[in-house]
């Protein structure tokens, strides 16, 4: 009994507990709001989950739409379903979502989530979905283009739910309905648009219920229709064969595009890119290589969004002149003769025709010429009016009128030229035959030449003693006469080989053409060898050479003297053993390879084309003994011992070198072993060249040298150069020359110029500088030793002054203490030295170092050359500044390169 009661009580308790659980079970929808508001076009997600203790007791969980239909699960076959449900993971949580990817206005309503709990209790929860429409720009282009002087509405049509309020702003200010503006629901109307209305307008839409606001900036650009600027004239001319361009210019906004039309054919030239074309952007009509058929009316149309404008131009073609005929003519010269040159020219417009002679740059003028009344220029038009005939009329034609003439036709299209020839015929003339006398001799061929000028060419015949030399003579008979003919006109040469004296005489050359005859005479004379030489003088004689001067001969035999000859032998020889030497006229007459101290016999003769004349003017001379060579002749301006003017100075083109050249002198019986070249810097005093106190350069050249390169010279300096030849006997008299080098601004004084690989030599001034520098360095070392050991000398004095100054200046002492570790001065003592503390300033110490001047004179073998005058001498000293440690020399030569 007690057990039954306990069971009943337990059952009652469990029933009460189950009822309490069932009563608290429910569904929860997230977002947790009974009303959901979403804009149309947005996505939406509603989540339904059971709010129970045991979710396994939930079944039949689903969503229904406002129509009561169950919302299906997502169908994989549909790419984009409008509305569907899906489980959220994990599956055991039983969370069912309602998804709407894109809300529509028809989706407004109540959506219900329901479920069955414990198979007995129905659970449900609802949410109301309300859609709103955001501000949408239905017709509000961001760029709009009104036309000037017209009424234009700036469009701005807006849709929204709830409806939006629209107003306008410009430059931050509200635009209200006024004189020229009318604010409407779908736009802003502007009355009588002007260019000042350009700018940015803002269309503002407001929904007060939702607090939404949207702005749409609209750029307004006022367009103006095209207007021709007047750059295109009504008529234009194009020149045949050239490129033609016509430009059509119009103003407007936006920039207009252009179209060119040929009016007579209505052809759009912008679509034809061949020879005739048009540029739609630049408005240019282009015609390449204009032809006559391009003449027409052309229309240009400028067009933009605001309208069009048209202009028409008439293009005429200028046809270049052409010369069709300009014939060559022939006219005989004479008092009553007349020459007419006709030139036929065409072109549009008809060209003007004139002439000129090619040998004269000036053109003839129309009518009678002011400087030559024989010449007239005239012209007429052809009967059809398409040709201009120009005429050049020359009366009383002269031979000088012969030549080329130029016809010149000119019009707007340009100028064209053509040459024609006027041939003036005349009888023969021997004006250009210079031969009047010819010399010949036995068995020697001589040419007699005639040149006959005539038009037409003349035929030439030869006569001697009144007979025609070649009439009736041919072949072997003609050759036996000694005459040969080359050419019969207009140039003819008669070759004569005289074999007897009867062939000398007067020959006549006769030229004949249809206008007349001319005769020219040439005298053939007999030439002989020259007569004896009038006089021969011995000019220079050395041990091995002799130089002659010739005078004569008295009679050259009819031909100029070509050579002089000498026949010479030793006194002990006969003339059959004599030697000969021949020189051309006006050459150096030097006989070489003679023996020293030898007696020679000489005789002389002259030679022309015929041969040598008789030997004459016999002389006897004895060559001197062997001696030193002759003076070398320098190839340049020789030094004069008396004048010494600046014009006698040879200028080197280089600042530091000079190429010296000379002729090989006579060795006077002994071969030249070597040459000596010496160069010394000099300066001119009054009329003399004096040596400067600088070292000279000497060079010895072995062998037969004839050139030498003087190097290491100073710029802008005069040098006296000597060349001596030496043989076993001794030295020759020196050949002398003065050379001046050019200036070289890039070279520093005292520095040797090193150019072309040459090494400079150190001058005496440079040596002085090096010696002074070495002395200064030695003094500095000695003073430093004195400072370190005995604390005396210049360095010690300077150090003591620094230290004593540090005592008197506290700030300087502090600074010195900071740096004392960096610059230890063991010789810097605080001990005062009265001598060092003297207030007097230190004076510069000057050390006089004499410099020995080189006074080696150039010698000519006898007396020394004057050196330097006393007034030119300078004292040389070196100044040493103990404060600045700088040395300098007080010597500066007047013309010294250092």
Swiss-Prot record:
It comes from the Eukaryota. InterPro entries: Cell_Adh-Cytoskel_Orgn, FN3_dom, FN3_sf, Ig-like_dom, Ig-like_dom_sf, Ig-like_fold, Ig_I-set, Ig_sub. CDD domains: FN3 (cd00063), Ig (cd00096), IgI_4_MYLK-like (cd20976), IgI_VEGFR_like (cd05742). Glycans are attached at residues 35, 51, 149, 192, 297, 328, 447, 457, 580. It is found in: Membrane. Residues 532-626, 644-745 form the Fibronectin type-III domain. GO terms for biological process: anatomical structure morphogenesis; cell differentiation; homophilic cell adhesion via plasma membrane adhesion molecules; nervous system development. PANTHER family: CONTACTIN 5 (PTHR45080), IG-LIKE DOMAIN-CONTAINING PROTEIN (PTHR45080:SF8). GO terms for cellular component: plasma membrane. Neuronal recognition molecule. Involved in a pathway recognition for axons during the development of nerve fascicles. It is a single-pass type I membrane protein. Residues 23-764 are extracellular. The keyword Glycoprotein applies. Residues 783-898 are cytoplasmic. Keywords: Cell adhesion, Developmental protein, Differentiation, Disulfide bond, Glycoprotein, Immunoglobulin domain, Membrane, Neurogenesis, Repeat, Signal, Transmembrane, Transmembrane helix. Residues 31-124, 134-219, 226-316, 321-423, 428-525 form the Ig-like C2-type domain. This is Fasciclin-2. Residues 1-22 form the signal peptide. The chain crosses the membrane at residues 765-782. Disulfide bonds join 48-113, 156-203, 248-300, 343-407, 450-509.
């Amino acid at each position: 009994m007690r057990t039954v009661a306990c069971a009943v009580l337990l059952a009652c308790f469990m029933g009460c507990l189950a009822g309490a659980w069932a009563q608290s079970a429910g569904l929860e929808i997230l977002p947790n709001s009974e009303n959901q508001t979403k804009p149309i076009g947005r996505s939406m997600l509603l989540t339904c989950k059971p709010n129970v203790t045991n979710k396994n007791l939930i079944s039949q969980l689903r969503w229904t739409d406002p129509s009561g239909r169950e919302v299906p699960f997502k169908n994989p076959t549909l790419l984009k379903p409008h509305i569907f449900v899906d489980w959220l993971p994990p599956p055991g949580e039983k969370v069912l979502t309602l998804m709407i990817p894109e809300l529509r206005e028809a989706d407004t309503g109540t959506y219900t989530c329901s479920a069955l709990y414990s198979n007995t209790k129905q659970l449900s929860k609802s949410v109301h979905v309300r859609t709103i429409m955001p501000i949408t720009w239905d017709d509000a282009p961001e760029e709009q283009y009104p036309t000037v002087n017209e009424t234009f509405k700036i469009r701005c049509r807006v849709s929204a739910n709830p409806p939006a309020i629209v107003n306008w702003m410009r430059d931050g200010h509200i635009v209200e309905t006024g004189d020229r503006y009318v604010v409407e629901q779908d736009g802003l109307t502007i009355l009588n648009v002007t260019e000042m209305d350009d700018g940015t307008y803002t269309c503002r839409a407001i929904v007060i219920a939702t607090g939404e606001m949207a702005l749409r900036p609209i750029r307004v650009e006022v367009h103006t229709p095209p207007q021709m600027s007047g750059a295109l004239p009504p008529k234009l001319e194009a020149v045949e064969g050239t490129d033609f361009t016509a430009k059509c210019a119009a103003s407007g906004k936006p920039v207009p595009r252009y179209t060119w039309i040929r009016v007579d054919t209505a052809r759009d030239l912008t679509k034809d890119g061949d020879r005739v074309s048009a540029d739609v952007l630049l408005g240019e009509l282009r015609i390449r290589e204009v032809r006559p058929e391009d003449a027409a009316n052309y229309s240009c149309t400028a067009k933009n969004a605001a309208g069009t404008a048209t202009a028409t131009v008439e293009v005429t073609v200028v046809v270049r002149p052409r010369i069709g005929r300009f014939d060559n003519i022939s006219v005989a010269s004479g008092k009553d003769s007349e020459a007419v040159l006709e030139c036929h020219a065409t072109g549009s417009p008809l060209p003007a025709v004139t002439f000129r002679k090619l040998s004269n740059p000036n053109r003839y003028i129309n009518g009678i010429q002011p400087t030559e009344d024989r010449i007239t220029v005239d012209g007429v038009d052809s009967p059809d009016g398409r040709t201009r005939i120009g005429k050049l009329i020359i009366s009383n034609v002269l031979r000088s009128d012969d030549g080329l003439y130029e016809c010149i036709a000119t019009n707007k299209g340009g100028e064209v030229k053509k040459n024609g020839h006027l041939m003036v015929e005349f009888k023969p003339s021997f004006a250009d035959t210079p031969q009047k006398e010819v010399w010949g001799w036995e068995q020697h061929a001589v040419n007699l030449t005639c040149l006959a000028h005539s038009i037409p060419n003349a035929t030439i015949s030869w006569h001697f003693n009144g007979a025609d030399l070649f009439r009736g003579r041919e072949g072997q008979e003609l050759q036996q006469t000694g005459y040969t003919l080359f050419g019969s006109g207009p140039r003819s040469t008669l070759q004569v080989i005289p074999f007897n004296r009867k062939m000398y005489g007067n020959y006549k050359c006769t030229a004949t053409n249809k206008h007349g005859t001319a005769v020219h005479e040439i005298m053939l004379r007999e030439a002989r060898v020259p007569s004896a030489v009038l006089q021969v003088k011995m000019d220079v004689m050395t041990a091995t050479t002799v130089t002659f001067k010739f005078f004569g001969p008295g009679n050259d035999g009819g031909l100029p003297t070509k050579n002089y000859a000498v026949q010479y032998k030793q006194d002990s020889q006969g003339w059959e053993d004599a030697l000969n030497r021949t020189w051309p006229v006006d050459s150096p007459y030097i006989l070489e390879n003679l023996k020293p101290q030898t007696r020679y016999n000489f005789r002389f003769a002259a030679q022309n084309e015929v041969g040598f004349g008789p030997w004459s003017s016999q002389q006897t001379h004895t060559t001197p003994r062997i001696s030193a060579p002759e003076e070398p002749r320098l190839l340049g301006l020789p030094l004069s011992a008396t004048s010494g003017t600046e014009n006698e100075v040879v200028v080197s083109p280089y600042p530091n070198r000079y190429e010296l050249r000379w002729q090989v002198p006579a060795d006077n019986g002994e071969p030249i072993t070597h040459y000596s070249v010496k160069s010394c810097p000099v300066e001119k005093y009054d009329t003399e060249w004096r040596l400067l106190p600088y070292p000279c350069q000497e060079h010895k050249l072995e062998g037969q040298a004839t050139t030498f390169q003087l190097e290491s010279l100073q710029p802008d300096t005069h040098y006296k150069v000597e060349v001596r030849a030496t043989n076993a006997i001794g030295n020759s008299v020196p050949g002398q020359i003065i050379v001046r080098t050019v200036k070289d601004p890039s070279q520093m004084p005292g520095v040797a110029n090193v150019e072309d690989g040459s090494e400079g030599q150190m001058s005496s001034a440079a040596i002085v500088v090096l010696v002074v520098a070495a002395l200064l360095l030695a003094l500095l070392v000695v003073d430093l030793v004195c400072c370190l050991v005995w604390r005396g000398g210049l360095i010690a004095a300077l150090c003591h002054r620094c230290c004593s100054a540090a005592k008197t200046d506290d700030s300087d002492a502090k600074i010195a203490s900071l740096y004392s570790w960096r610059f230890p001065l063991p010789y810097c003592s605080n001990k005062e030295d009265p001598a060092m503390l003297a207030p007097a300033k230190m004076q510069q110490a000057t050390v006089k170092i004499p410099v020995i001047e080189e006074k080696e004179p150039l010698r000519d073998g006898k007396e020394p050359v004057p050196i330097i005058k006393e007034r030119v001498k300078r004292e040389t000293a070196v100044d040493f500044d103990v404060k600045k440690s700088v040395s300098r020399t007080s010597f500066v030569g007047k013309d010294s390169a250092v």
